[in-house]
């Protein structure tokens, strides 16, 4: 029989008051068990007309301030986040039968933070940030290939490719984090953390 924590949940939920600490534990375990991209997440956004969209992105950093990913600011998600800063993330790890949902508000990271991450990327990835007009219609693939060639000629020094102003990071400051564990006969286990007005995380159990 699986050990239980103080709330009667599987012991993988531990007994932590801080959901960021629990997220770190689960992410570390996912890195050991997931065959591909344990930091992959679905990001849900919506525009000013409340029409939703969702796509996969990669988490690049997390701490007490939030969860950070990077993108073209003029992409669909970039434009939607400018219109509506409310967003949600979902991590799903099949190898662990676990899921984490996070919702909150989005803000753009500081330029110095974006510069540091951008400069850690490979040359081709940095060129791609310049060459791709993300989410815009392409006439054909040659149009993109030619754009890549142009920017490789412009930035032929692999150590000196500046970050384009239209490319940066977003930080999601969480107001709600839910941890989910698959259960027999769909009797799943769910632990919810909500950030209250006094600045504390409040734990609660949710029905499957």
Give names to the regions the model predicted:
Residues 1-208:
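Binding-site signature for planar aromatic cofactors or substrates
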